[in-house]
């Protein structure tokens, strides 16, 4: 298979080849840091799920007099789960994209590079959809429970994410459905799609998407405080 490389593809390959060791070291350090962050987020998710399960068990035995109390507690933990799960989706998207970036920055066979390129398209297709959906749930929670909280920056970033997703919908869907997550029934279509993958296009997508999800993480992370306030409204300020 002969890939149709543009002049920019060739230029980027040269630049990457000259700096691949430094790029790889920097990415490895960043990936390790982000993996540690993800582990802390998972603890938060598991904490919420564990307490939701406790509430469910209590509700099975609850009387009509205390059922409302247990439902309120369950609701508070479900709201916290939305926050923590959104942070987890952001972190996982960042880690996955950086993993592919590491491959693209490595001295490996050409077919491995192009396999990573098509994976980038599918990863962005899948994760951007999940993030739009999850941030929608998060916005609904904030508007309902904390209507005075300023979510203007959050809304701006979410709007940018949605626009990015829509602007790149055709190319993301094409690669995902024709040569990666699915395979087109027409072999010529598969070959044509594969041969027209470009390193430059993939890097441009990565740079723009990573910027957006980094900004999204910076506006969602402070909402953990809203989760604490939500729990305090139900349990009081002694609840951890």
For the regions a language model picked out, list residue spans one by one.
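Amphipathic alpha-helical interface segments
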Residues: 1-171, 195-240
């Amino acid at each position: 298979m002969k890939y149709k490389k543009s002049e920019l593809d060739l230029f980027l390959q040269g630049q990457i080849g000259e700096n691949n060791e430094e790029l790889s070291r920097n990415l490895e350090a960043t990936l390790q840091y982000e993996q540690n962050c993800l582990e802390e987020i998972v603890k938060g998710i598991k904490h919420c799920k564990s307490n939701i399960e406790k509430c469910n068990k209590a509700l099975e035995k609850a009387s009509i007099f205390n059922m409302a109390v247990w439902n309120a507690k369950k609701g508070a933990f479900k709201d916290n789960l939305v926050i923590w799960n959104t942070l987890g989706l952001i972190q996982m998207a960042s880690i996955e994209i950086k993993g592919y970036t590491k491959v693209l920055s490595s001295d490996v066979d050409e077919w491995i590079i192009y396999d990573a390129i098509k994976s980038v398209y599918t990863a962005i297709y899948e994760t951007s959809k999940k993030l739009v959906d999850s941030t929608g749930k998060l916005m609904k929670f904030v508007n309902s429970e904390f209507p005075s909280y300023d979510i203007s920056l959050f809304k701006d970033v979410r709007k940018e994410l949605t626009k990015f997703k829509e602007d790149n919908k055709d190319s993301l869907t094409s690669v995902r459905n024709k040569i990666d997550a699915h395979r087109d029934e027409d072999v010529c279509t598969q070959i044509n799609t594969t041969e027209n993958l470009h390193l430059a296009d993939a890097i441009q997508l990565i740079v723009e998407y990573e910027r957006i999800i980094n900004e999204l993480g910076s506006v969602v992370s402070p909402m953990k405080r809203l989760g604490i306030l939500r729990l305090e409204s139900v349990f009081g300020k002694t609840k951890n």
